[in-house]
A protein has these predicted regions:
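Single transmembrane alpha-helix segments in multi-pass membrane proteins
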Residues: 1-27, 48-55, 187-205, 237, ...
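Alpha-helical transmembrane segments within multi-pass membrane transporters and channels
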Residues: 26-65, 109, 209-210
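Transmembrane helix-bundle core of multi-pass membrane transporters
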Residues: 53, 57-121, 147-150, 169-179
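Hydrophobic core segments of alpha-helical transmembrane domains in multi-pass membrane transport
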Residues: 65-72, 106-117, 152-163, 189-195, ...
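Cytosolic-side transmembrane-helix boundaries in multi-pass membrane proteins
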Residues: 113, 132, 139-146, 169, ...
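Membrane-helix/interface signature in polytopic inner-membrane proteins
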Residues: 113-153
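Transmembrane alpha-helical segments in multi-pass inner-membrane proteins
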Residues: 159, 170, 174-235
């Protein structure tokens, strides 16, 4: 859709905090559903702010990320939420089928669905078109504002699902689990995977490759016992090179 969502890390944290608290005191299935719906709502709110109020997505989502992070911190009181008795909630990510966890199956399912939507449907083509040239798409009859709103809503829902799966796996949640570090790790994976930072170009499978590449780097630093600060520096350099490469490619192609 051509926008940048810097609130994914904050949404990730907020939704896992809400889902975890609800799972401790109530129905874990309802907790998961509510968490995902809240994520979609946050994303939709970002979409409304950026499209209908014409605020730059970078600024808008940066601002909402602070609001969301503050809200998550108020809910937790700045403390870690943990409860190893919520077995129903734990089953969401830990149950295995064919020796593969449901968390992995969920990721595979989401990837397949998004790949089909983006490459095989009219809605997917509209998303690429809106990101590539919003004005031309609008003149061609594409409802660009609604396409961008839906794209932001999907981003929020995906962030929420990721946060809930993570808290289900470790049976804990914290407002500090998201934030800038996670957001820029996500951005690095996406850009390294070949998705243009300006929109209109990319593929789901390439994004998966980019994210796996970034994850391998992170695991490598951990296994080698290297200073985490060097990992941040490395990710920053990788992100800069990837964005620079994208800009250079666009200049060459006119």
């Amino acid at each position: 859709g051509g926008g940048i969502d810097l609130s994914v890390g904050a949404t990730y944290a907020l939704c896992q905090v809400i889902a975890m608290k609800m799972a401790i005191t109530g129905d874990p299935v309802l907790a998961i559903l509510v968490g995902v719906i809240i994520g979609i709502g946050v994303g939709a709110a970002n979409g409304v702010i950026t499209t209908f109020f014409r605020i730059n997505s970078l600024i808008a989502t940066l601002a909402t990320s602070f609001v969301i992070t503050g809200g998550a911190a108020l809910i937790t009181g700045g403390n870690l939420i943990t409860n190893f008795a919520v077995t129903g909630y734990a089953a969401f990510a830990r149950t295995q089928f064919l020796d593969v966890t449901t968390a992995a199956w969920t990721m595979i399912g989401v990837v397949i669905v998004l790949a089909i939507v983006l490459s095989r449907t009219i809605a997917g083509r509209y998303m690429y078109a809106a990101g590539s040239n919003a004005e031309a798409s609008r003149l061609a009859g594409v409802r660009v504002q609604w396409i961008k709103l839906v794209t932001f809503a999907l981003s929020g829902g995906a962030a929420a699902l990721g946060g809930i799966l993570d808290s289900s796996r470790v049976l804990s949640a914290s407002s500090a689990n998201g934030g800038t570090a996670l957001t820029f790790t996500v951005l690095a994976g996406i850009v390294v995977g070949g998705t243009s930072i300006l929109g209109g170009e990319g593929a789901v499978w390439r994004t998966v490759v980019g994210v796996l590449f970034i994850a391998i780097i992170g695991n490598g630093f951990t296994l080698l016992g290297w200073n985490p600060l060097y990992e941040q520096i490395t990710l920053g350099v990788i992100l800069l090179l990837a964005v620079g490469g994208d800009a250079w490619s666009r200049l060459r192609t006119g």
